[in-house]
Amino acid sequence: VNLWQVDIRPADGQPDSLGVQAESAARELGISNRLQIQGIHGFLVQGSLDAPSASKMAREYLADPIAQRVETALVGDPKLSAYGGDSKQLVHVLLKPGVMDPVAQSTLQMLKGLGFAADEVRTFRKYWISGHPSGESEVISRLASRVLSNDSIEQIVLGPLKMDKLSIGAPYSLTLTRVPIDQLNDKELMELSKSGQLYFSLPEMQQIQSYYRQIGRQPTDIELETIAQTWSEHCSHKTLGGRIQYQDENGTRQFSSMLKETIFAATKKIRETLGANDWCVSVFKDNAGVVTFDKEHHIVFKVETHNHPSAIEPYGGANTGLGGVIRDPLGTGLGAKPICSTDVFCFAAPNYPPDELPPGVLHPRRVISGVVSGVRDYGNRMGIPTVNGAVYFDDRYLGNPLVYCGNAGLLPVDKVEKKPHAGDWIVALGGRTGRDGIHGATFSSVELTSESESISGGAVQIGNAITEKMVLEVILQA
């Protein structure tokens, strides 16, 4: 079994988009205005491939023969470093182990279908950097962590890659783990909540402790994770659904459930007032709202936010924000056809002084670029246009941007209702569970801090538009 590295670079006369983007970001973030950066992307392919097969694979199927050139060799071969020159700092950027790599998955599927003996594939980016003073490692370190990579999901390798195989992870065997909480004091309960990324409040932890004392046993780790997910802000809207006292110039109002007593109540009253002219079909009961359109179709519409994920991994956060909201009309009734998307973004000013950024906060320019690219790319891969949007700037969004993604779909008038029955099959489709996306729901219940990127980086899921596109086609045909 060999491990081949395929470097794909621009052909002579073609623009170096990766290098240009990195140089621009380095200037904008105040890292350096003297750097010259060359960038390429590539694949690591593991399998029983000889040199002629690897060369054919790379030349004919992994690169554009007109706009790109390839260099194929076993990992560690010196010629893989020659393109940028020996005097330049070489930096590789790879996804961390366990993070889903949709491009690699699609590539592996293609190569196997073409008859190549490929077992595993990984993607990477590669940069050669010059123009910094000799020995000024701080510049390279800042550039690598703030421009070339995102530490929440990616890792940096300085110099040539040194490996002889791709790690595919360790085998997993279920071990029943019980968490002893019956004798924990309040401080220890909150330490457990934080260390486990459960993000319960103290009263919630006390309630869980009380319940398991009553039934006479300790909870399993899976039970705690399940309760944390169900009670999270993301899933239960604790803030909007909670008891709130509101005071203004007109006095004080007490809400037992703010969401039910405002938005829900107002909608119900308007529908009752309209009577026979009510154009709402399904409200607050399915994955998306449904309103009348014509004799054959209803309009399905849903908007959701993806703020916390976009704050620590802008591209992935916005990418899965749109992917998730496309899923909602698709899962409404017996399945609506998503036809267009919309968005609203709220950011801090793009010219915010880099040296005034709080610890752990990404610069607004990087957030803006990542969010816009994430929404654009996912919609393009799904074949669903983003037809309108809005942007608002205010420095109060520095630590946590607002990223609203919406989608509209068409639903046949006779496909509004669905009812599951005992014996129905439940089918899970998508990427295997990996490092990404873990604690994505509970992450919504905690405030962002300077440690969020390192502690909760894995909470941001990697989108897989290619798989969702296939799921969409299957559901609509069914």
Task: Set out the residue ranges of the language-model regions.
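Core nucleic-acid recognition elements
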Residues: 1-478
